[in-house]
A protein has these predicted regions:
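Small beta-barrel nucleic-acid-binding modules, primarily SNase/OB-fold domains
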Residues: 2-11, 16-172
């Protein structure tokens, strides 16, 4: 009897852990690029979402390189069918931030678009939220930022670019 209870409890724990690690992936068409890390999409059922690209923080539009980051993301994503990868949270199949945006990694043709924004120097790796990333993504995004900086790509052409989170504080 004890062994049955033990195995039942073990199964329940494993099941709960697996549910929490499942990612809610869905496809949607990009309708609008708001800025270098936010897009509007519509899914196959016609539901519209605002999506915040996880793991990165792009310059604000009125900040140096903000328009370039927005333009580059538009060039790549506008009217494209993409895969959105998000984590289930609070009973929803995806995570939503305080601005009611779905937090997601965007995949286009197998390529991580969030990471490519960092690689090209159009965004910082948003280390404040890196614990929400997988260890491999954390490492990839961090290395991408180091490489972009070393190669003076995009915003790293400037000697000391101001990070968006600092820019927003200064503008309040």
């Amino acid at each position: 009897m004890k062994s049955i209870i033990f195995f039942t409890n073990t199964f329940v724990i494993i099941f709960i852990l697996n549910i929490n690690s499942v990612r809610a992936d869905f496809t949607a068409k990009v309708q609008r690029v708001v800025d270098g890390d936010t897009v509007h999409v519509i899914d196959k059922a016609g539901k519209k979402f605002k999506v915040r690209l996880t793991g990165i923080d792009a310059p604000e539009k009125n900040q140096p390189y903000g328009l370039a980051a927005t333009y580059k993301l538009t060039e790549i994503l506008i009217n494209k069918l993409v895969l959105l990868k998000s984590k289930p949270n609070n009973g929803k199949p995806y995570t939503i931030d305080r601005y009611k945006r779905v937090l997601a990694k965007i995949i286009l043709d197998g390529k991580d678009i969030n990471l490519s924004q960092v690689l090209r120097g159009y965004a910082w790796h948003f280390k404040r939220y890196q614990k929400q990333q997988s260890p491999s993504d954390r490492e990839l995004y961090s290395e991408a930022e180091i490489d972009a900086k070393k190669n003076e790509l995009g915003l790293w052409e400037e000697k000391n670019p101001i990070a968006p989170w600092k820019w927003r504080k200064m503008k309040k």
